[in-house]
């Protein structure tokens, strides 16, 4: 008995066990866990149990209990207790309370098994206290072990039969399970199979269920007790216990119809003996059943049988035809025995004709099909055709009439057609439907097929910071569908901490992580029964980047000062400090936070606002500082007629550079003095010193401009617009709103009055974020990685590029995911952790001190794929003088790129140059390399190719010499050809014999030493086998065939025997040897043509001259003489005999020429005056035992024939040892033919076997030798 598979370590130190309680009582299950504080769940039939009046759940420390109150039959299911990953299943069995008055059986005869009883008539009601079979509860399906149905306890009366059935699920089993039946603890019942015990098994291919049965025949009191059924597979084991109760047969004074059956046997002195029961265990019953008494009293027997069944005399007789019609064929003989049927074969023939006459429907012209199938959500029409167009039709669902309700069901009547339309089919519509017209019904079954759940909107990759909320969202094709979430291949469940939350909203499915951690990074998968979607989650530590810092400002009184900075996280808040103290906003001081930009605005600047200002992001160790300087303009007293002067640090000798960020406002205040008030002119000068713009309509050189400008010349800049000049008495203001790159350059300011002029050059530099780089290029694509390359942007924004930021997204997604937080300094990056087979795109950002550029165009879509692994099992299959045959198996890992083919190369020994062996790629896993040079030593290798490139090479380690290998010829004879091949006339013979040998051997066939005729027998040869083909076998094809292989001087020969058989001819010389009383003795001789096969027996039939209907008297009868008894007085009978061999019965029969007349009884019989002849004789073997040589492992029989009066007792010996108690041997005796069957003999079973026959007149014995050969 195989040991059960070892289980993983359980969280339970004490497990609940299967318990049996009485109905109405209380059941308690207890469990103990290894640790305290573990949450324990209880389940009933897969559904979690909650605390209620019915179920009480308690937990104290590590002890847990489940109490079920008022146990009923509905509670007899499978329960389970779960702690962590451990799950223990157990059962609750409910037994009915014992009854005070047991129901006595109705019949005195032994009660057969419930499965063997024929269906009784509808009106019978033998025992009102026993519920009918239809109301019995169904056997519970076993969800724990291997059993689908366990054997149940049984009860039988002495002499009755009972069958125990066990069903095992075979869907997950690779081969048939092993089943053993035991009585008590250790008694294996396989060794007890015989007259009273039979074991059966079968396999249902449709339901994939193995059925094993143990049948107990003619039970006696010693059979009662406990039994066990054990089933085991390679890695699983289960067992089930059941009990058998055997009741004594009740005493009844009524007539037992079986007492009318008598077996007649010959006793010494020629007297005929009748006995109700002559057989004993181990011996065959002798004589023949006498049904003559029943012929005259059939009606009385039927009434007696009815009384035996507990019926009243007023009830009608049993309809034996109805019982036979409903009963299975295996019950026919039992019914015939029970109800006194004498001509069972005749009744069965008539019953067969009755069954063929199917009753035609009068109400329906066309019925419903047996079954229909429809997809969920679709509609279906069920249609019938009725004979009467005015007939009323009812439609039933699961036995309940369907009522009109909305648009769900539509009833239509079109002529003779009646149509039921079911709209929007759901799983609730999967049921049995009936159409009822008057008293006739038409049945069908509707199966609603649920389509697979598809993922219509897949998951998207996400990148978050530690502590942020993560929400994965996908959309499926069905509302409320069940999906499974996994992280890195491990299923996610609702934990006690509720780390993961699952949410459904219509067709949308959500996975929510409230507070993400670094450990949450990974690949998340959502699975349905029709699709899979994968997304990646990257959780980064919080890191703040400053895209734009605050700058120092110099402003005048009553001007506006604006400090602005930009950080990477728009959710980060911060505070502003002035000389270390927090700035409090008021009407003049404003603080704003819009997105990633933080601003501090000071209106109407005063000298008190001059200070150091700082911005501190909340939660980060950053301090952004800048200084605000207050410019106080002091104008000294200038006498009248003073030349103009520009009060700047730069007086035109060296350019002063003013830097402004693109998009910001540039305000340049230039203090001036002079009397009279000078005229201000602004000009923009290019790098060569030429005037870009001028104040007059004519072009002026710088020298001309400086000397010839007048006060009434046209000004370059307007007082309104994006670029403008504001004039004041003591200063002028140059303003650029939203500085742009084109505003960069040298600006010249000229002040002039009649007294003189002054000028100054101011350099304005506009800095900006870089231009977006060009689209990145993808290279070096692997299984989950790739290399990204890009070029610097064409314009860096006037500031050096600090680094780059890379983003990635799936082709079908809209969400870009950032791959790096630290700026990339290099122009290449290796992206990892991608999913093979998914299409991605990349884009790049350039970052300088001002900020981040716009994204680059997306790269070309690409798919991470990897080359396959190298092919496996690369070997040389065959070598010839110019060819080498190679074979291999596909790579273990192919990947999402598939497999385009293989490339095969070879290299000469000592060389490093590999030469392609085949033109292009081959898709096969074998190759024949041709046109090689004989004698070369070559290395071979093979590579697998797909979109990603070549795999590693599988190389043959040793060089292969191109030269034919001589191999001795050897014929491999199939097992079924090692013994005589028997075929019937007309069948096709196709014999294939494989062989080995190189070079290709010469093949020759012979029959009985003569060459085969090619016109009659076909021969086809190949390099590995030879085939003998006969399209239509005839008797002359029988014989010994020899096939010979020859390679030079080496040969191998095998002989095959073919036997063609045909039906035998009829027996010869049949005659009536004697007619006496109600008996006729027949004799005949064997047929002249035995059909080339041994005659197995004869079939004897009789026919009354009046009806000439033939009835079989004997089947498989071996002797050439017989006595037909129990003939009817006054009738004339003809007799015929068929011969039988392996092909079947002969086409014609030998028939007696003259009828045998059974004379009527006359005067009283006067015994003869002479002494009666003594018919007794000592045993004598009429057919000897034959020496045999058999193959081990196949059942073998030894047969002989004996005669003797009285019937001798038979003993079998092996090497003088009695075999009576050995279960390996089975002994049979039928009509004088003795057979010893040896089950699967081994070489140890060889030896001398002796058969000994003993009776009161003497004894005889015969011996043979048995050799057991081991198959080669």
Swiss-Prot record:
<feature type="region of interest" description="Disordered">
    <location>
        <begin position="95"/>
        <end position="147"/>
    </location>
</feature>
<dbReference type="Pfam" id="PF18362">
    <property type="entry name" value="THB"/>
</dbReference>
<dbReference type="Pfam" id="PF00041">
    <property type="entry name" value="fn3"/>
</dbReference>
<keyword id="KW-0787">Thick filament</keyword>
<dbReference type="InterPro" id="IPR036179">
    <property type="entry name" value="Ig-like_dom_sf"/>
</dbReference>
<dbReference type="InterPro" id="IPR003961">
    <property type="entry name" value="FN3_dom"/>
</dbReference>
<dbReference type="GO" id="GO:0032971">
    <property type="term" value="P:regulation of muscle filament sliding"/>
</dbReference>
<comment type="function">
    <text>Thick filament-associated protein located in the crossbridge region of vertebrate striated muscle A bands. In vitro it binds MHC, F-actin and native thin filaments, and modifies the activity of actin-activated myosin ATPase. It may modulate muscle contraction or may play a more structural role. May be involved in the early phase of myofibrillogenesis.</text>
</comment>
<dbReference type="GO" id="GO:0032982">
    <property type="term" value="C:myosin filament"/>
</dbReference>
<dbReference type="GO" id="GO:0032036">
    <property type="term" value="F:myosin heavy chain binding"/>
</dbReference>
<feature type="domain" description="Fibronectin type-III 2">
    <location>
        <begin position="870"/>
        <end position="965"/>
    </location>
</feature>
<feature type="domain" description="Fibronectin type-III 3">
    <location>
        <begin position="1066"/>
        <end position="1161"/>
    </location>
</feature>
<feature type="domain" description="Ig-like C2-type 6">
    <location>
        <begin position="969"/>
        <end position="1057"/>
    </location>
</feature>
<keyword id="KW-0514">Muscle protein</keyword>
<dbReference type="InterPro" id="IPR040849">
    <property type="entry name" value="MyBP-C_THB"/>
</dbReference>
<feature type="domain" description="Ig-like C2-type 4">
    <location>
        <begin position="543"/>
        <end position="640"/>
    </location>
</feature>
<dbReference type="InterPro" id="IPR003598">
    <property type="entry name" value="Ig_sub2"/>
</dbReference>
<dbReference type="InterPro" id="IPR013098">
    <property type="entry name" value="Ig_I-set"/>
</dbReference>
<feature type="domain" description="Ig-like C2-type 5">
    <location>
        <begin position="644"/>
        <end position="763"/>
    </location>
</feature>
<feature type="modified residue" description="Phosphoserine; by PKA">
    <location>
        <position position="300"/>
    </location>
</feature>
<feature type="modified residue" description="Phosphothreonine; by PKA and PKC">
    <location>
        <position position="274"/>
    </location>
</feature>
<feature type="modified residue" description="Phosphoserine; by PKA and PKC">
    <location>
        <position position="265"/>
    </location>
</feature>
<dbReference type="InterPro" id="IPR007110">
    <property type="entry name" value="Ig-like_dom"/>
</dbReference>
<keyword id="KW-0393">Immunoglobulin domain</keyword>
<dbReference type="InterPro" id="IPR013783">
    <property type="entry name" value="Ig-like_fold"/>
</dbReference>
<protein>
    <recommendedName>
        <fullName>Myosin-binding protein C, cardiac-type</fullName>
    </recommendedName>
</protein>
<dbReference type="GO" id="GO:0007155">
    <property type="term" value="P:cell adhesion"/>
</dbReference>
<feature type="domain" description="Fibronectin type-III 1">
    <location>
        <begin position="772"/>
        <end position="868"/>
    </location>
</feature>
<feature type="domain" description="Ig-like C2-type 2">
    <location>
        <begin position="359"/>
        <end position="451"/>
    </location>
</feature>
<keyword id="KW-0130">Cell adhesion</keyword>
<keyword id="KW-0597">Phosphoprotein</keyword>
<dbReference type="InterPro" id="IPR003599">
    <property type="entry name" value="Ig_sub"/>
</dbReference>
<dbReference type="GO" id="GO:0003779">
    <property type="term" value="F:actin binding"/>
</dbReference>
<dbReference type="GO" id="GO:0031430">
    <property type="term" value="C:M band"/>
</dbReference>
<feature type="compositionally biased region" description="Low complexity">
    <location>
        <begin position="102"/>
        <end position="117"/>
    </location>
</feature>
<feature type="modified residue" description="Phosphoserine; by PKC">
    <location>
        <position position="1169"/>
    </location>
</feature>
<keyword id="KW-0677">Repeat</keyword>
<dbReference type="Pfam" id="PF07679">
    <property type="entry name" value="I-set"/>
</dbReference>
<feature type="domain" description="Ig-like C2-type 3">
    <location>
        <begin position="452"/>
        <end position="542"/>
    </location>
</feature>
<dbReference type="GO" id="GO:0045214">
    <property type="term" value="P:sarcomere organization"/>
</dbReference>
<feature type="domain" description="Ig-like C2-type 1">
    <location>
        <begin position="137"/>
        <end position="252"/>
    </location>
</feature>
<dbReference type="GO" id="GO:0086004">
    <property type="term" value="P:regulation of cardiac muscle cell contraction"/>
</dbReference>
């Amino acid at each position: 008995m195989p040991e059960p598979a070892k289980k993983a370590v359980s969280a339970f130190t004490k497990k609940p066990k299967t318990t049996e309680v009485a109905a109405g009582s209380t059941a308690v299950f207890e469990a103990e866990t290894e640790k305290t504080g573990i949450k324990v769940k209880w389940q009933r039939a897969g559904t979690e149990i909650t605390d209620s009046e019915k179920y009480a759940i308690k937990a104290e420390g590590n002890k847990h209990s489940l109490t079920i109150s008022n146990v009923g039959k509905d509670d007899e299911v499978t329960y389970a207790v779960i702690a962590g990953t451990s799950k223990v299943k157990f059962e609750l069995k409910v037994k009915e309370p014992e009854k005070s008055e047991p129901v006595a059986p109705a019949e005195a005869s032994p009660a057969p098994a419930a499965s063997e009883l024929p269906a009784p008539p509808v009106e019978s009601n033998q025992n009102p206290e026993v519920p009918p079979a239809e109301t019995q509860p169904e056997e519970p399906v076993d969800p724990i072990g291997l059993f689908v149905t366990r054997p149940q306890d049984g009860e039988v009366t002495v002499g009755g039969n009972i069958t125990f059935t066990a069903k095992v699920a075979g869907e997950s089993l690779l081969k048939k399970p092993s089943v053993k039946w035991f009585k008590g603890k250790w008694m294996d019942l396989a060794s007890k199979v015989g007259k009273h015990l039979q074991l059966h098994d079968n396999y249902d291919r449709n339901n994939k269920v193995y059925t094993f049965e143990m049948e107990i025949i003619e039970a006696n009191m010693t059979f009662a007790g406990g039994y066990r059924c054990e089933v085991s597979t390679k890695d699983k084991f289960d067992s089930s216990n059941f009990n058998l109760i055997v009741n004594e047969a009740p005493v009844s004074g009524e007539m037992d119809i079986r007492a009318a059956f008598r077996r007649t046997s010959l006793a010494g002195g020629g007297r005929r003996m009748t006995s109700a029961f002559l057989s004993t265990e181990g011996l065959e019953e002798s004589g023949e059943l006498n049904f003559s008494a029943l012929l005259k009293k059939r009606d009385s027997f039927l009434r007696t049988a009815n009384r035996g069944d507990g019926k009243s005399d007023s009830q009608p007789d049993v309809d034996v035809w109805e019982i036979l019609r409903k009963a299975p064929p295996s019950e026919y003989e039992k019914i015939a025995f029970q109800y006194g049927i004498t001509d069972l074969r005749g009744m069965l023939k008539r019953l067969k004709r009755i069954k063929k006459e199917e009753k035609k429907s009068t109400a329906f012209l066309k019925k419903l099909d047996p079954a229909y199938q429809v997809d969920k959500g679709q509609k279906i029409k069920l249609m019938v055709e009725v004979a009467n167009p005015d007939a009323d039709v009812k439609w039933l669902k699961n036995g309940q009439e369907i009522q009109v309700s909305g648009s769900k069901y539509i009833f239509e009547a079109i002529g003779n057609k009646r149509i039921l339309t079911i709209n929007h089919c759901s799983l609730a519509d999967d049921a049995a439907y009936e159409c009822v017209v008057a008293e006739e019904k038409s049945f069908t079954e509707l199966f609603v097929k649920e389509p697979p759940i598809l993922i219509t909107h897949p998951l998207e990759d996400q990148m978050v910071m530690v502590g942020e909320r993560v929400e994965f969202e996908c959309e499926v094709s069905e509302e409320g569908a069940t999906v499974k979430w996994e992280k890195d291949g491990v299923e996610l469940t609702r934990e006690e901490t509720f780390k993961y939350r699952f949410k459904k909203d219509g067709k949308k499915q959500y996975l929510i992580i409230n507070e993400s951690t670094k450990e949450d990074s990974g690949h998340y998968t959502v699975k349905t029964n029709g699709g899979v979607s994968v997304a990646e989650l990257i959780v980064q530590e919080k890191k703040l980047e400053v895209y734009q810092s605050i700058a120092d400002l110099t402003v005048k009184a009553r001007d506006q000062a604006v400090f602005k900075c930009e950080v990477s996280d728009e959710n980060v808040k911060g505070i502003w400090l002035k000389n270390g103290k927090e700035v409090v906003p008021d009407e003049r001081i404003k603080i704003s936070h819009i997105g990633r930009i933080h601003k501090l605005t000071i209106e109407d600047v005063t000298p008190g606002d001059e200070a150091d200002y700082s911005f501190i992001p909340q939660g980060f160790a950053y301090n952004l500082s800048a200084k605000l300087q207050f410019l106080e303009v002091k104008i000294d007293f200038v006498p009248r007629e003073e030349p103009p002067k520009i009060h700047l640090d730069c007086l035109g000798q060296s350019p002063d550079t003013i830097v402004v960020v693109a998009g910001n406002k540039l305000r340049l205040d230039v203090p001036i003095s002079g009397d009279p008030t000078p005229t201000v002119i602004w000009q923009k000068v290019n790098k060569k010193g030429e005037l870009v713009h001028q104040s007059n309509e004519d072009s002026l050189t710088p020298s001309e401009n400086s000397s010839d400008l007048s006060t009434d010349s046209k000004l370059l800049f307007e007082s309104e617009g994006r670029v403008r000049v504001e004039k004041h008495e003591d200063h002028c203001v140059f303003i650029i709103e939203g500085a742009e790159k084109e505003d960069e350059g040298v600006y010249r300011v000229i002040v002039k009055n009649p007294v003189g002029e002054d000028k100054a050059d101011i350099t304005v530099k506009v800095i900006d974020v870089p231009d977006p780089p060009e689209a990145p290029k993808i290279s070096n694509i692997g299984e989950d990685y790739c290399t990204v390359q890009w070029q610097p942007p064409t314009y860096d924004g006037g500031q050096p590029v600090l680094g780059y930021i890379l983003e990635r997204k799936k082709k079908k997604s809209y969400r870009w995911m950032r791959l790096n937080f630290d700026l990339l300094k290099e122009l290449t990056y290796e992206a990892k952790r991608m999913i093979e087979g998914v299409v991605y795109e990349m884009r790049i950002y350039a970052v300088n001190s001002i900020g981040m550029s716009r994204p680059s165009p997306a790269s070309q879509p690409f798919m991470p794929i990897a080359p396959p692994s190298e092919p496996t099992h690369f070997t040389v299959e065959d070598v010839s003088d110019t060819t080498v045959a190679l074979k291999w198996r596909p790579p273990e890992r192919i990947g999402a790129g598939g497999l385009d083919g293989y490339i095969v190369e070879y290299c000469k020994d000592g060389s490093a140059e590999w030469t392609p062996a085949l033109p292009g790629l081959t898709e096969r896993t074998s190759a024949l390399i041709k046109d090689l040079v004989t004698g070369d030593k070559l290395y071979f290798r093979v590579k697998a190719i797909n979109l990603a490139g070549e795999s590693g090479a599988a190389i043959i380690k040793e060089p292969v010499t191109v030269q034919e290998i001589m191999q001795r010829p050897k014929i491999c004879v199939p097992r079924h050809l090692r013994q005589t091949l028997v075929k019937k006339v007309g069948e096709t013979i196709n014999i294939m014999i494989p062989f080995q040998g190189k070079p290709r051997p010469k093949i020759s066939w012979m029959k009985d030493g003569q060459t085969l005729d090619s016109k009659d027998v076909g021969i086809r040869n190949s390099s590995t086998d030879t085939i003998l083909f006969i399209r239509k076998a005839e008797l002359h094809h029988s014989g010994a065939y020899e096939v010979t292989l020859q390679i030079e001087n080496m040969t191998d020969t095998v002989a095959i025997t073919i036997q063609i058989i045909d039906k035998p001819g009829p027996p010869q010389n049949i005659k009536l040897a004697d007619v006496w009383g109600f008996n006729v003795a027949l004799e005949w001789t064997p047929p002249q043509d035995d059909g080339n096969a041994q005659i197995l027996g004869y079939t004897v039939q009789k026919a009354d001259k009046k009806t000439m209907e033939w009835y079989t008297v004997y089947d498989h009868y071996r002797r050439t003489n017989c006595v037909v008894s129990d003939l009817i007085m006054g009738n004339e009978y003809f007799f015929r005999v068929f011969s039988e061999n392996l092909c079947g019965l002969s086409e014609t029969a030998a028939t007696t020429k003259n009828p045998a007349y059974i004379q009527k009884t006359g005067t009283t019989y006067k015994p003869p005056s002479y002494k009666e002849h003594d018919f007794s004789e000592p045993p004598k073997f009429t057919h000897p035992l034959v020496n045999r040589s058999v193959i081990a492992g196949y059942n073998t029989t030894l047969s002989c024939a004996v005669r003797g009066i009285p019937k001798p007792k038979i003993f079998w010996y092996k090497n003088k040892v009695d075999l009576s108690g050995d279960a390996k041997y089975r002994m049979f005796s039928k009509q004088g033919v003795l057979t010893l069957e040896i089950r699967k003999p081994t070489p140890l079973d060889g030896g001398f076997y002796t058969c000994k026959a003993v009776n009161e007149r003497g004894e005889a014995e015969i011996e043979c030798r048995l050799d057991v050969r081991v198959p080669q």
